[in-house]
Amino acid sequence: MAVRELCFSRQRQVLFLFLFWGVSLAGSGFGRYSVTEETEKGSFVVNLAKDLGLAEGKLAARGTRVVSDDNKQYLLLDSHTGNLLTNEKLDREKLCGPKEPCMLYFQILMDDPFQIYRAELRVRDINDHAPVFQDKETVLKISENTAEGTAFRLERAQDPDGGLNGIQNYTISPNSFFHIKISGSDEGMIYPELVLDKALDREEQEELSLTLTALDGGSPSRSGTSTVRIVVLDVNDNAPQFAQALYETQAPENSPIGFLIVKVSAEDVDSGVNAEVSYSFFDASENIRTTFQINPFSGEIFLRELLDYELVNSYKINIQAMDGGGLSARCRVLVEVLDTNDNPPELIVSSFSNSVAENSPETPLAVFKINDRDSGENGKMVCYIQENLPFLLKPSVENFYILITEGALDRELRAEYNITITVTDLGTPRLKTEHNITVLVSDVNDNAPAFTQTSYTLFVRENNSPALHIGSVSATDGDSGTNAQVTYSLLPPQDLHLPLASLVSINADNGHLFALRSLDYEALQAFEFRVGATDRGSPALSSEALVRVLVLDANDNSPFVLYPLQNGSAPCTELVPRAAEPGYLVTKVVAVDGDSGQNAWLSYQLLKATEPGLFGVWAHNGEVRTARLLSERDAAKHRLVVLVKDNGEPPRSATATLHLLLVDGFSQPYLPLPEAAPAQAQADLLTVYLVVALASVSSLFLFSVLLFVAVRLCRRSRAASVGRCSVPEGPFPGHLVDVSGAETLSQSYQYEVCLTGGPGTSEFKFLKPVISDIQAQGPGRKGEENSTFRNSFGFNIQ
């Protein structure tokens, strides 16, 4: 009574809300959909967005969800596509049993504004079950004086499928005594009757065995069989008679196992064996056989399994009484299950938000549904929350309730509420269900983020790797929730010439600073910028701080060799007299370092030599000197690789390559040996080759000049003609050198060579091409061949 008064006292508080909510529910519709049973999980049912006339993405924006009446999630909604899908395989027989059509009811809930769409899903049957007889053999005792046309009712087969997939026909194996007749029952089911066509004669045949077949209407059809054994008896005049054709009784659903449901009674006026009556279930389903049992001698029916009103609220039981002579009679027992208050109310929360802003009155916090599986007064419910709370329960349709704030909340007075939702039924004794929820009151955004320091100084060594973490900034916010979530950003620099966006970046979530590229101390020694911290409140509040970045110098410059040049041009060859004394200064490697301090201190080291021990390099000045006397057995050509290393950490280095040629005096001309020349040629053979080569070059030069003049005089009109000449083969040609680097002269170009000599020097000088019309061959090839020539021999072409 107190609960009912409490409910009435709140009616006036929620009346205006109920009326307001009725406006939002006025557009709610009713949807009917269908799906075939046993379809795979995730099968498409319908596109709810199109069916409800909503734009794409609207379902997700409104927080749409699907709620079933029995709290089982048979369906799944993809709110992004709007597709309603099956969440599991649906078995119509398990869901609805023999009931047809099989309907599942559910609701579609939507927010902003809150709406409920009621819908139903029909599960269409498929022929996935074959008919099954409970008894594989049925025994009929028929007297031999039974009249033709007498019908004997047989137990029907069971088929969980419904409609056309259920049982549609019965047949009997061919015989001369019986045929099958199909009859209907009050429940709309068909059952077989065995009709006698010809009188039986016990003396001719005492027993017959027939096969009864049940056929369903599926495609393809399924069938089940049972054996009917007929025993022919002597004359039995009277069949048993029940005291009542219909027995009606009631049983509470909490009745214990073994509880006596009812006792049926039948009498037979015959005597002896023909008067002995036995009782049995007839045409009973498996559910009846597992729930009840019958005493075959007394006719008492007992409870074999506990009853459940919520599953089955009534039973129809067919009882057969048969005497010893095979005659039988039937009656029906109707058992009504009485409901007891054995199910507490259920509370199903569909949506819940545990946080509400302090300045948000009449805000929905939770949507839930209540249900009680009991019936009558046992299934009636009241729902309420504690007194003195700034919240209201607003009733809706289909037993839905919405928990909303009654007015604006004050976080400074109370930041958290523990609400108990109580649902009580009106049964005896009363059962109740409680559900506790916690609501947090969130603060408004009234505090700006504050940096831990007003300015930050960061140090980073130059040549850092890109994306290097160089430091962090941090800010805190006194608010809570999203108002306290800080986002960091780089503010535009005051120096417009500073490319800040390409220098550093900041992690928006944690304030970590990263160098976007490698910094160069020589280019940029320091820079500063400002960072901002902004919360996620509305409106957003922010603050800023100064960040200074100092770049530290590093040993990032390798030594650079000034002499000899190492720029890819032809190598420079130094001449060394064979008469040089030990310690003779051959040349000096000159190098510089762009760094400063100890990073620029250079040391020299001989890394590789054609003949180790012949030359040495001074460590501090790079001078290359002979280490011992030269002999005739020493190779004429030598290649030295000098390592130049600075004193940085880690040290950096460069190499210089020197080409040395041992000569017997500076007055003799020399020619750098091609790479293919033997490195171990004897000195005397080299001298002979040089003399022969010089003579050959002189002769060929003179012959070329004469040939050129002759061709010019004979063919004045052909300015682009090219002179030809033969060049003797050999490792050292005479006065002609092939600019392509081969041992014979190219067919495209010939050059005049002038060999000049002076004290201590000797060089080749190319005056001009013998063929003047170079344009006919193409400027590109000229440049390419000249470049190849210079790179191969290091000579200057004029």
Curated annotation (Swiss-Prot):
Among Pfam families, the record links this protein to: Cadherin, Cadherin_2, Cadherin_C_2
**What CDD domains does UniProt report for this protein, alphabetically?**
Cadherin_repeat (cd11304)
In this chain the Cadherin domain maps to 35-133, 138-242, 247-347, 352-451, 456-561, 568-671
Q: Which GO terms describe its cellular component?
A: plasma membrane
- Please, which domain of life does this record's source organism belong to? Eukaryota
Keywords, alphabetical: Calcium, Cell adhesion, Cell membrane, Glycoprotein, Membrane, Repeat, Signal, Transmembrane, Transmembrane helix
| Cytoplasmic compartment spans | 712-798
Entry-listed glycosylation sites: N169, N418, N436, N567
Which stretches face the Extracellular side?
A: 27-690
* Membrane spanning stretches: 691-711
Q: Where in the cell is it found?
A: Cell membrane
In the record, biological process GO terms are: cell adhesion; homophilic cell adhesion via plasma membrane adhesion molecules; nervous system development
The record's function comment reads: Potential calcium-dependent cell-adhesion protein. May be involved in the establishment and maintenance of specific neuronal connections in the brain.
Q: What is this protein called?
A: Protocadherin beta-10
Task: State the species of origin.
Answer: Pan troglodytes (Chimpanzee)
Organism classification: Eukaryota, Metazoa, Chordata, Craniata, Vertebrata
Q: Which gene encodes it?
A: PCDHB10
